[in-house]
């Protein structure tokens, strides 16, 4: 009986936004994995930050503010007036900060919040996501409370991302507001990136996707590419 052939993973392509991708690449390379970044989402500032300024005046109305990512933290606090930043970091704003994972928690602490102001998934959670966060915060919410979810918007200005956590909160009587703090837009792939993508579609490279947006932004500029031999991991 002949042995089943194995396909060696030549490399991993990380498709997260540039700053996030570089962190993932460094972590993978530290484990001996050949990893490269091919960002398929570009993070950009809002064209109109006025909605964020209005929300900043109302932070005390919220029992918690959930940040979907480190990018949400960075762009929210970059546009948050200094007085509101100081009030929150000094504990004069009672809103809890919710984080889906360690990267977002680090960003919150770098923004000035203390660890005791932040709720995040348990350290031994099998996955860092909204489900793991909800397992830790579900018991602290009460009907009638308000929770703000800070996330990104797409190129049309529509909120992007999963609505799972908002659905759980609404189901238990919590009022949810969404706030876009940044835009997620499709990058323009240059010829080098297109060549690498075409090569990775057939050479055993493992694509690492963390959103359906990234997949769309890969396929759209390469309409004639055959992806049937491509290999990928999706984080959710």
Task: List PLM regions with ranges.
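Conserved beta-alpha
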Residues: 1-235
């Amino acid at each position: 009986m002949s042995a089943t052939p194995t396909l060696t993973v030549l490399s991993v392509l990380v498709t997260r936004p540039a700053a996030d991708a570089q962190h993932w690449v460094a972590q993978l390379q530290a484990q001996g994995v050949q990893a490269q970044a091919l960002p398929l989402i570009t993070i950009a500032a809002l064209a109109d930050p006025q909605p964020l300024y209005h929300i900043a005046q109302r932070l005390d109305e919220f029992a918690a503010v959930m940040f979907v990512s480190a990018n949400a933290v960075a762009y929210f606090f970059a546009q948050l007036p200094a007085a509101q930043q100081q009030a929150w970091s000094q504990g004069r704003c009672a809103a809890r900060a919710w984080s889906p994972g360690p990267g977002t928690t680090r960003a919150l602490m770098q923004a000035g919040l203390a660890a005791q102001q932040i709720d995040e998934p348990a350290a031994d959670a099998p996955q860092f996501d909204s489900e793991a966060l909800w397992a830790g915060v579900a018991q602290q919410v009460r009907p009638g409370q308000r929770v703000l979810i800070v996330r990104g918007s797409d190129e049309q200005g529509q909120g992007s991302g999963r609505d799972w956590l908002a659905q759980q909160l609404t189901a238990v009587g919590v009022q949810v507001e969404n706030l876009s703090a940044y835009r997620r837009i499709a990058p323009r792939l240059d010829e080098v990136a297109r060549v690498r993508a075409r090569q990775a579609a057939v050479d055993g490279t493992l694509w690492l996707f963390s959103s359906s947006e990234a997949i769309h932004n890969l396929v759209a500029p390469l309409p004639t590419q055959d992806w049937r031999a491509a290999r990928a991991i999706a984080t959710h």
